[in-house]
């Protein structure tokens, strides 16, 4: 029986083209592969039981996949492949209980997210936004009021040493700064080999000039960066959130920024997405913001689609996909 795959429509550009380009789709049309595919005709925010009854595999970007998604009487789907590394939008256990596996793209995202974190750091350290304004507004003589920060005498703190955290330490090492890492689940020798020092989260918050979060969102990491931990940071330090919005208590962060408890922040993610029009962060000139897409590049999406669609192809051929998310 032909394996039928649906791709969520939010993976299309406004012009109707695949956002990741056409080349990865060639994986679904290999000679000898009994598979057909389509972009799902409906635009949905949650995968419905009807869709789970229609397709053998679904490639998902932002729509949620919940227990309700697999509650229908005619469940056909056997694999949900996430276009991305995070899977907080997927009820992995509920799917597994129904015999549906979940995959993600942990390898493809490592370099792009790490580069995006460094983009925030370099822009904040170099005072890029205000210097752009000075130039455009003919305020040239004010430039000595906005001295940037050199990095060789600073400390980078990385919270979470998974694939992205490791890649970030690797890319950041040539700057010659001190690098701290907080992750109780990673062997200290791994961190040392990357040039970092393993410390507690509290010590990392106290000592770092730039704190970068790269952890997955779950009940244990929700509001991991709270008011108490923000209060530990240097007044000259910056927080960079590249993970998920709820990793940081956003109200506590706003309070810390207003009070001058920390110097600023770079945020690619928010507790509410899209960000509300009245969110105070939008009016803060010491905060850089991106719409959960700073790592999005042509290479990033191409590699993600290859990895994610590759999982579906492997499954359709009776092979075990490389990046199955374990429930629980």
PLM features: residue spans?
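N-terminal Rossmann-fold NAD(P) dinucleotide-binding loop
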Residues: 165-166
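N-terminal glycine-/charge-rich "phosphate-binding" loop or analogous flexible N-terminal tail
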Residues: 1-55, 316
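Phosphate-binding beta-alpha-beta segment of Rossmann-like dinucleotide-binding domains, i.e.
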Residues: 98, 106-155, 170-174, 324
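Glycine-rich Rossmann-fold phosphate-binding loop(s) that bind the pyrophosphate
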Residues: 161-162
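Rossmann-like adenosine-cofactor binding region
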Residues: 65-70, 185-280
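Rossmann-like dinucleotide-binding domain for NAD(H)/NADP(H)
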Residues: 102, 236-328
């Amino acid at each position: 029986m032909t394996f039928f795959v649906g791709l969520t429509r939010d993976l299309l550009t406004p012009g109707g083209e695949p956002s990741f380009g056409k080349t990865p789709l060639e994986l679904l049309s290999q000679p000898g592969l009994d598979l057909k595919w389509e972009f799902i005709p409906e635009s949905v925010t949650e995968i419905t039981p009807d869709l789970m009854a229609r397709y053998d595999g679904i490639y998902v970007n932002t729509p949620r996949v919940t227990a309700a998604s697999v509650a229908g009487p005619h469940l056909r789907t056997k694999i949900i492949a996430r276009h991305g590394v995070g899977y907080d939008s997927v009820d992995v256990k509920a799917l597994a209980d129904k015999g549906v596996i979940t995959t993600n793209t942990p390898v493809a995202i490592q370099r792009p997210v790490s580069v995006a974190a460094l983009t925030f750091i370099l822009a904040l350290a170099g005072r890029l936004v205000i210097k752009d304004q000075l130039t455009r507004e003919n305020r040239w003589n004010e430039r000595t009021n906005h001295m940037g920060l050199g990095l060789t005498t600073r400390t980078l703190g990385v919270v979470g040493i998974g694939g992205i955290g490791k890649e970030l330490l690797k890319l950041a090492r040539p700057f010659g700064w001190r690098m701290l890492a907080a992750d109780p689940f990673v062997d200290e020798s791994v961190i040392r080999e990357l040039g970092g020092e393993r410390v507690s989260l509290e010590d990392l918050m106290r000592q770092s000039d730039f704190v970068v979060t790269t952890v997955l969102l779950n009940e244990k990491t929700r509001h991991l960066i709270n008011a108490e931990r923000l209060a530990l940071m240097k007044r000259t330090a910056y927080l960079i959130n590249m993970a998920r919005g709820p990793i940081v208590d956003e109200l506590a962060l706003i309070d810390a920024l207003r009070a001058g408890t920390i110097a600023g922040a770079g945020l690619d993610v928010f507790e509410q997405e899209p960000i509300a029009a009245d969110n105070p962060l939008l009016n803060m000139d010491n905060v850089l913001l991106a719409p959960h897409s700073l790592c999005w590049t042509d290479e990033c999406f191409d590699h993600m689609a290859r990895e994610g669609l590759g999982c579906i192809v492997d499954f359709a051929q009776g092979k075990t996909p490389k990046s199955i998310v374990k429930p629980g």
